[in-house]
């Protein structure tokens, strides 16, 4: 029997690795991305490339404009994307309830197609300030999924997977390389231009670059300004 899984796919390094991991675990993968009002479209173009390259059975992009709410440097142009590293607490790049919103869409799609597994790229090491990237959040969402769905209450349980949650960026990169992930297809930058070139100075760029250095893997990232 075919095991189907929904994989949240942003187009970045982490979610690309998670898609490859779900494939390697024997799942027929369905990739889900969201056009939520992020600052650039290159992230979604990257998601399309990654989904195709890694052989997702289907890739859906959902429109849900979170810019109408604001509250994050990623959805509100009045807020600056930080370039000076983590300052403690919850970063301003946290998008209110984003993982909960996206997992709920994934849950609905999974139940509709008979899938019982959800994968997403939560990581508690590099982004420890995000409340929806913690192990307890993953466990709580799995409980919710099984309380809030027909399948769940009938005993056909859902499982929420966050396979990179305790991994460093270097460990994630090395795992992805072994699985054949082409990181040149991905975009992680918070301020990428329309061609997908990274700014090189935002927190996401700094963490990504340091990850490649620590892993001893050549960085395929295209930067707006040569470094």
From Swiss-Prot:
Pathway noted in the entry:
Purine metabolism; 7-cyano-7-deazaguanine biosynthesis
Instruction: Output the GO biological process annotations, alphabetical, semicolon-separated.
Output: queuosine biosynthetic process
- The coiled-coil regions, if any, are none
Per its UniProt record, what CDD domains does this chain match?
A: QueC-like
Kindly indicate whether the keyword Cell wall biogenesis/degradation belongs to this entry.
Answer: no
Keywords associated with the record? ATP-binding, Ligase, Metal-binding, Nucleotide-binding, Queuosine biosynthesis, Zinc
Q: Which reaction does it catalyse?
A: 7-carboxy-7-deazaguanine + NH4(+) + ATP = 7-cyano-7-deazaguanine + ADP + phosphate + H2O + H(+)
One GO molecular function term of this record is:
zinc ion binding
- Residue positions annotated to bind Zn(2+) are 189, 199, 202, 205
EC number, UniProt record: 6.3.4.20
UniProt-listed Gene3D superfamilies? HUPs (3.40.50.620)
Which InterPro entries has this protein been placed in? QueC (IPR018317), Rossmann-like_a/b/a_fold (IPR014729)
Q: Which parts of the sequence bind ATP?
A: 9-19
Q: How is the cofactor bound?
A: Binds 1 zinc ion per subunit.
Top-level taxon in the UniProt lineage: Bacteria
Cofactor(s) recorded for this entry are: Zn(2+)
Q: Its function?
A: Catalyzes the ATP-dependent conversion of 7-carboxy-7-deazaguanine (CDG) to 7-cyano-7-deazaguanine (preQ(0)).
Similarity remark: Belongs to the QueC family.
In its UniProt entry, what is this protein called? 7-cyano-7-deazaguanine synthase
């Amino acid at each position: 029997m075919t095991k189907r899984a929904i994989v949240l796919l942003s187009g970045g390094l982490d979610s690309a690795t998670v898609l490859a991991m779900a494939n390697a675990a024997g799942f027929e993968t369905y990739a889900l991305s969201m056009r939520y009002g992020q600052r650039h479209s290159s992230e979604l173009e990257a998601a399309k490339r990654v989904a195709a390259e890694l052989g997702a059975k289907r890739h859906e992009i959902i429109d849900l404009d979170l810019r109408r709410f604001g509250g994050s440097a990623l959805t509100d142009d009045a807020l600056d994307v930080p370039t000076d590293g983590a300052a403690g607490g919850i970063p301003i790049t946290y998008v209110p309830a984003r993982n909960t919103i996206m997992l709920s869409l994934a849950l609905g799609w999974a139940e509709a197609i008979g899938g019982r597994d959800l994968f997403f790229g939560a990581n508690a090491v590099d982004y420890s300030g995000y409340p929806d990237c913690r192990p307890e959040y993953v466990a709580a969402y799995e409980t919710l999924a099984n309380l809030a769905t027909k399948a769940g209450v009938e005993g056909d349980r859902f499982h929420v997977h966050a396979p990179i949650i305790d991994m460093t960026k270097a460990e994630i990169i090395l795992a992805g390389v072994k699985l054949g992930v082409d990181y040149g297809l991905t975009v992680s930058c918070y301020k990428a231009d329309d061609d997908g070139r990274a700014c090189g100075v935002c927190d996401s760029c700094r963490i990504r670059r340091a990850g490649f250095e620590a892993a001893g893997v050549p960085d395929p990232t295209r930067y707006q300004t040569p470094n």
